[in-house]
């Protein structure tokens, strides 16, 4: 689907950065059918020209080596959880498309490098190691039969995480080596789309929450604590349904995945954590995204464990945060589009 929004007067009182020039829309490349409606609405309200580019029906001609001047830039919003919606092929196609765009000099936000980290939890841990940042002890496997041997030296419980994840897809906890062995023998270990997975020590969360830190333009914009319920690994902030005070979030419950047990609150991490998150984003080429970390309840150790180039803003953000991050995102996109010549 393609949509070029009409140029219209801005509906906001406060001053904003310069929008993209008329006739040079911002291309939003995406797959999920609903996650970006709030972004589209904000762009339309601001009169910012944009184009919807749906990954599933997209094609490109690799012989076209000159930069496409019909759009100012491309904002990659491809989701690694696409394979849960029968769009797994879109993921690998996107790698080729982003590489093609960047080879021809097109400005891409969250380009090929960012997306490679997005779709590889193994690469994320290697990045954390290169930055000297702590992460849970892990092993990388590509055969389920190797899971038990790979767990040697790890403290149980462990989790097996598919390399290509998204919204906690396929993450399974095993409380003992025997339980892991039985699952491997019965073919119950999910290695995910690329048949690569982590065997990773399970970290019990101090305070019962994890923390997600968001960046726009590679800089800290906000952070939230997400309070866990049971052993859920699906922590998409756009799907969380209530604040820590129990207030329902009206925009939070998609039809297919209500998570009414999850609670969220705004939180500002220590300066050293914010700096570490910004270092991760810069090293991974993630300009808009998020980083998740957890505090081990056993010893108070902080561990970073997930980088997200596609990180959805928390539902009903003005109520939770006190401001609308989509406004900040659109200002960033407009400024970047205005810098393209």
Label each region the model flagged.
Residues 79-83, 164-165, 310:
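Short glycine-rich anion-binding loops that position phosphate/pyrophosphate groups of nucleotides
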Residues 158, 221-222, 289, 301-305:
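Protein kinase-like catalytic core scaffold
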Residues 172-281:
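Phosphate-binding site of ATP-dependent enzymes
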Residues 264-268, 272, 282-286, 295-341:
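C-terminal active-site "lid" helix and adjoining low-complexity regulatory extension at the edge
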């Amino acid at each position: 689907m393609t949509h070029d929004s009409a140029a219209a007067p801005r509906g906001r009182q406060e001053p904003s950065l310069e929008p993209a020039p008329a006739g040079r829309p911002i291309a939003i490349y995406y797959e999920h059918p609903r996650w970006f409606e709030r972004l589209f609405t904000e762009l339309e309200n601001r009169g910012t020209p944009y184009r919807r580019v749906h990954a599933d029906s997209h094609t490109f001609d690799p012989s076209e080596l000159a930069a496409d001047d019909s759009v100012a830039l491309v904002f990659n919003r491809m989701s690694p959880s696409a394979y849960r919606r029968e769009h797994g092929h879109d993921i690998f196609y996107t790698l080729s498309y982003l590489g093609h765009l960047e080879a021809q000099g097109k400005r891409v936000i969250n380009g090929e490098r960012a997306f490679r980290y997005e779709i590889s939890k193994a690469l994320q841990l290697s990045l954390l190691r290169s930055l000297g940042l702590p992460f849970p002890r892990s092993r990388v496997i590509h055969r389920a039969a190797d899971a038990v041997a790979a767990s040697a030296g790890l403290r149980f419980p462990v989790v097996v995480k598919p390399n290509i994840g998204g919204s906690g897809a396929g993450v399974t906890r095993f409380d003992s080596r025997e339980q892991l062995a039985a699952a491997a023998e019965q073919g119950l270990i999910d290695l995910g789309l690329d048949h690569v997975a982590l065997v990773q020590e399970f970290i019990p969360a101090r305070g019962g929450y994890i923390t997600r830190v968001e960046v726009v333009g590679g800089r800290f914009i906000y952070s939230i604590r997400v309070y866990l319920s049971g052993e859920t690994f699906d922590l998409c902030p756009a799907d969380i349904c209530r604040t820590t005070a129990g207030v329902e979030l009206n925009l939070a419950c998609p039809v297919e995945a209500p998570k009414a047990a999850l609670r969220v609150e705004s939180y500002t991490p220590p300066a050293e954590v914010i700096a570490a998150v910004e270092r991760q984003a810069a090293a991974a080429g993630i300009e808009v995204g998020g980083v998740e970390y957890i505090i081990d309840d056993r010893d108070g150790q902080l561990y970073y464990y997930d980088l997200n180039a596609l990180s959805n803003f928390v539902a009903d953000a003005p109520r939770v945060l006190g401001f609308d991050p989509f406004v900040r995102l659109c200002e960033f996109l407009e400024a970047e589009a205005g810098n393209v010549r």
